[in-house]
């Protein structure tokens, strides 16, 4: 891990999305991916193990969805920074996640500059 870069946990059941997020994030000067989870149960465990500075969270996943996972992570660490990464048409879920404590939202499909903007805005603090 590079010194001073923010540590990111990427949570998404789609390997392609995790790979894209990892590629984009690791190219930035501000952050790097330290762990990946394919479901919410794994995400909570990895959050406790790695204590990342920020989590990118899919909403619809097997075993445990993003809203429940957001709640569990925030119950462990109320200062956790969680950014929802979700597809068009899931506005109600995104709104619910925001009410539960998610800090920002990135819509799929996303572009590299959108990810970088959120990293600077949320993790760059």
Question: Where in this protein do the model-derived segments appear?
Answer:
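Conserved acidic segment of CheY-like receiver
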Residues: 5-16, 21, 25
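Acidic catalytic/metal-coordinating carboxylates
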Residues: 39-42, 65-68
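C-terminal output helix
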Residues: 92, 110-119
């Amino acid at each position: 891990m590079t010194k001073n870069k923010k540590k990111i946990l990427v949570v998404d059941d789609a390997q392609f999305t995790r790979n894209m997020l990892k590629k984009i994030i690791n190219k930035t000067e501000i952050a790097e991916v330290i762990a990946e989870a394919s479901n919410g149960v794994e995400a909570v465990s990895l959050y406790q193990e790695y204590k990342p500075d920020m989590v990118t969270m899919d909403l619809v996943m097997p075993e445990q969805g993003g809203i429940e996972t957001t709640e569990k992570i925030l119950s462990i660490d109320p200062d956790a920074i969680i950014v929802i990464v979700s597809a068009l048409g899931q506005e109600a879920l995104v709104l619910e996640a925001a009410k539960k404590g998610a800090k920002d939202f990135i819509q799929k499909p996303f572009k590299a500059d959108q990810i970088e903007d959120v990293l600077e805005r949320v993790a760059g603090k």
